[in-house]
């Protein structure tokens, strides 16, 4: 284990543009259950999963009704806004401050990376801490709208003050496309990176799970084109992909990742930070 942690630290220090991808596993130590694990939200409440799959269809047909259900119905995800970041989130902030991590792309909607202080953050599936205009994609804080008053006055759904588009929660529903701005910026980071640190994700939710595969494939294609005289290679011919997860994933089995450090992200990531500090002395 120690050798892999030191190896990860050296790989990070040798990289020029390292990014991190994070999933539900990094937040379980903050008391937030995952979705499909033994104690996951969908595992324990299959009806909640079925309702989640129908949610976006309801929004498209009747956004006012969708908002009423959000404001009056049970919160199937619990109050994620009360959760606090853990050692894993803070470790990524330390790596960013040390200059070895350039961006975090997360599929989590809990807002914990923002709370921890990550500066360059792309929330692939949105955040419970924000609302989003479905037309112009501007984000807002829920406190900017008096949602209860709008419901009492029969004025749901809320409207964007700039373009009058319909406002929904920023979280991406099943069947809803990833917001184009986030998708584009994520692809740009994947294209630029020479190291990808994948933390706490089983890599089975698409299109997020494609990002590591795209990082690997884009380098092969980029340098094949350069060798063929069809363009200049943008960076090194290989990208280092490191997993930190409680168990092997499809990325491990497919050989997409170079190696995996097995364990809790809240324990492993702080050790990587300490190793980075020791190497920099």
Which positions does each model-derived feature cover?
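Conserved catalytic core of sirtuin-type NAD+-dependent deacylases
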Residues: 1-281
């Amino acid at each position: 284990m120690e050798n892999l942690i030191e190896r990860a630290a050296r790989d990070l220090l040798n990289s020029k543009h390292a990014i991190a991808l994070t999933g539900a596993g990094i937040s379980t130590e903050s008391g937030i259950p995952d979705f499909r694990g033994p104690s996951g939200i969908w595992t324990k409440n299959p009806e909640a999963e079925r309702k989640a799959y129908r949610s976006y269809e309801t929004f498209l047909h009747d956004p006012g009704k969708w908002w009423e259900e959000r404001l009056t119905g049970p919160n199937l995800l619990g109050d994620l806004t009360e959760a606090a970041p853990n050692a894993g989130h803070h470790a990524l902030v330390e790596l960013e401050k040390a200059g070895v991590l350039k961006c975090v792309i997360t599929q989590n909607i809990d807002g914990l990376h923002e709370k921890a202080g990550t500066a360059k953050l792309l929330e692939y599936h949105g955040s419970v801490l924000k609302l989003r205009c479905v037309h112009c994609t501007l984000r807002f804080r829920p406190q900017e709208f008096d949602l209860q008053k709008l419901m009492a006055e029969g004025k749901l759904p809320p409207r964007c003050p700039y373009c009058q588009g319909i406002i929904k929660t920023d979280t991406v529903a099943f069947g809803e496309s990833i917001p184009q701005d986030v998708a584009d910026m994520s692809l740009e980071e994947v294209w630029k990176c020479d190291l990808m640190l994948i933390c706490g994700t089983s890599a089975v939710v698409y299109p997020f799970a494609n990002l590591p595969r795209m990082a690997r494939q884009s380098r092969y294609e980029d340098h094949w084109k350069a060798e063929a005289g069809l363009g200049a290679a943008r960076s090194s011919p290989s990208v280092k992909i490191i997993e930190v997860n409680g168990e092997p994933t499809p990325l491990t089995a497919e050989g997409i990742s170079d190696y995996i450090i097995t364990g809790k992200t809240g324990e492993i990531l702080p050790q990587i930070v300490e190793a980075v500090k020791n190497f920099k002395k």
